[in-house]
Each structure stands twice: as structure tokens, then as C-alpha cells.
């Protein structure tokens, strides 16, 4: 009798634990980003991060990018880009043009494997200015 009660309690705790992980993932709907102060980049995507140092807009882009990252990316990629294992650790992203190329491809096209969406197409919702600001922050 006691074993059945203990088993049920463990099962209930396991279900609650898994439920908590599911709900902890949070809302992944992209949130608006205020890019006031950054120059307009136009509709055509740039190949290279326009805010990379020594750009005069670098510091503002980092500030905007930090806020935008925390609103839109941290749920999966972790605070300060330190992944908890759900998504790639963005600290390992190359800071050069090569990293820009990968980043641009990923934010425009997202990541879909076998029909499962691992990352939404962020460029459908966020502006190029906002996304390059996030890249600058990273």
C-alpha cells in the first residue's frame, strides 16, 4: 500500500516537473523593438553588420540589442547568450563577417528540421535594424 502511494507521489511530481519546463519556455512571439536613433537600413538586407565597432552607432546598437535580445531571444538562447541547451550558444558565434553570414541566414529563414520549427523567421517580424542591433549585442 505504501509503495503505491509513494509511486503515485513520484509520478505526480514528475508530471509537474515536466509541465513546469514546458510552461517555463514562455511566449516565443517576437516583441516589438524600438530602434530610434539607429539609421534606417532599407529593405535590402546588408551582408555585414553595419553597427560593428568602430561604427558611430555601435554603443546605441548594443544598448538596443541587449533589450531586444532579452525580449526575443533569451527564452531559447539563454540570458547573456549563454544557452541552457535548448538552442545554440551564441557566444560561440564568430564576431566576423562569417558569423554575420550565418546570423543573417538564420534570422531570415529560421530553422526548420523535419517540419519542426526550431527557430522562427525573426525577419518576418523584427526590422533589419533591430536584428543587426541584436547581433551587435551578441
Task: Annotate each predicted stretch with a short phrase.
Residues 18, 80, 94-97:
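Residues at alpha-helix boundaries and short interhelical turns
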Residues 81-84, 115:
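Short amphipathic alpha-helical interaction/hinge segments
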Amino acid at each position: 500500500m505504501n509503495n503505491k502511494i509513494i509511486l503515485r507521489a513520484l509520478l505526480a511530481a514528475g508530471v509537474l516537473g515536466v509541465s513546469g519546463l514546458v510552461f517555463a519556455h514562455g511566449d516565443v512571439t517576437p516583441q516589438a523593438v524600438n530602434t530610434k536613433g539607429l539609421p534606417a537600413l532599407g529593405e535590402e538586407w546588408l551582408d555585414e553588420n553595419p553597427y560593428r565597432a568602430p561604427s558611430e552607432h555601435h554603443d546605441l546598437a548594443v544598448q538596443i540589442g541587449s533589450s531586444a535580445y532579452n525580449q526575443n531571444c533569451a527564452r531559447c538562447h539563454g540570458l547573456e547568450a549563454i544557452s541552457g541547451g535548448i538552442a545554440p550558444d551564441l557566444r560561440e558565434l564568430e564576431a566576423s563577417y562569417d558569423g554575420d553570414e550565418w546570423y543573417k541566414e538564420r534570422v531570415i529563414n529560421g530553422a526548420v528540421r523535419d517540419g519542426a520549427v526550431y527557430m522562427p523567421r525573426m525577419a518576418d517580424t523584427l526590422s533589419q535594424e533591430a536584428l543587426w542591433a541584436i547581433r551587435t549585442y551578441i
